[in-house]
Amino acid sequence: MVAPTALKKATVTPVSGQDGGSSRIIGINNTESIDEDDDDDVLLDDSDNNTAKEEVEGEEGSRKTHESKTVVVDDQGKPRFTSASKTQGNKIKFESRKIMVPPHRMTPLRNSWTKIYPPLVEHLKLQVRMNLKTKSVELRTNPKFTTDPGALQKGADFIKAFTLGFDLDDSIALLRLDDLYIETFEVKDVKTLTGDHLSRAIGRIAGKDGKTKFAIENATRTRIVLADSKIHILGGFTHIRMARESVVSLILGSPPGKVYGNLRTVASRLKERY
């Protein structure tokens, strides 16, 4: 009778569902079992592997010490490294972007298409097409021609600005200037208004024949689009903040005359700054 503490020999069973117990590791035959007589050989092989690992670790250690000697150290003892752009380079990958076009902007997009795609193709070196089936504009980078890593995002912002309702010239400014942004908010984000109250708030922002909107744009050097209850502002960071304050005050019920007075102060500050 076998003692309860004795160990039984493990029997090697082939994996079910595979023909002839074939291995799932291609190129290496690891289905052979190890006999008890081959234990010494296995131990010798392990020792050889350990010595090989020690040799590799020694080579890597010497390589690291050699690389550490080439690092430039400043006066304070801190290492100085070259810029990543010079060492690694800018690698452009195949990337694509799809910008959906609202139905009411499809006709302006078709009419201005001959002026929209040249900046994307010639300046940003992107591949662009208008998909009429899905009503979208598709952009794609090409590593052979595209050089700017942020070209795809710039092109997407340009198309998005046009679909929001901005003029073509104002949208192209996003490609030329890096400090332009678009901020979007709704009237209900400022104050919950419905029915005629909402219509009057939008009317106060626009003014008669767009007079108030143009005054805010000229004073703050921004561009404003009123799309129903949504308001889109294009401009610099500080300019957007000034225009947003004027629009918010109009939504909250401030009379246009008071807003005009604040705009004069804002315009004088901008003239002093620039």
Curated annotation (Swiss-Prot):
Determine if Hydrolase is one of this entry's keywords: no
Region of interest: Disordered? 1-70
The Basic and acidic residues compositionally biased stretches are 51-69
A molecular function (GO) held by this record is:
unfolded protein binding
Task: List Phosphoserine occurrences by residue.
Answer: 47
Return one Gene Ontology term, BP aspect.
Answer: proteasome assembly
Give the Phosphothreonine positions (modified residues).
51
Q: Where in the cell is it found?
A: Cytoplasm; Nucleus, Nucleolus
Protein family membership: Belongs to the PNO1 family.
Assembly, in brief, is: Component of the small ribosomal subunit, ribosomal RNA processing complex (SSU RRP complex). Interacts with NOB1.
Q: What does this protein do?
A: Required for small ribosomal subunit (SSU) synthesis. Has a role in the processing of early nucleolar and late cytoplasmic pre-RNA species. Recruits DIM1 to nucleolar pre-RNAs. Indirectly required for cleavage at the A2 site of the 20S pre-rRNA, forming 18S rRNA, and at A1 and A2 sites of other pre-rRNAs.
Q: What is this protein called?
A: Pre-rRNA-processing protein PNO1
Q: Which organism is it from?
A: Saccharomyces cerevisiae (strain ATCC 204508 / S288c)
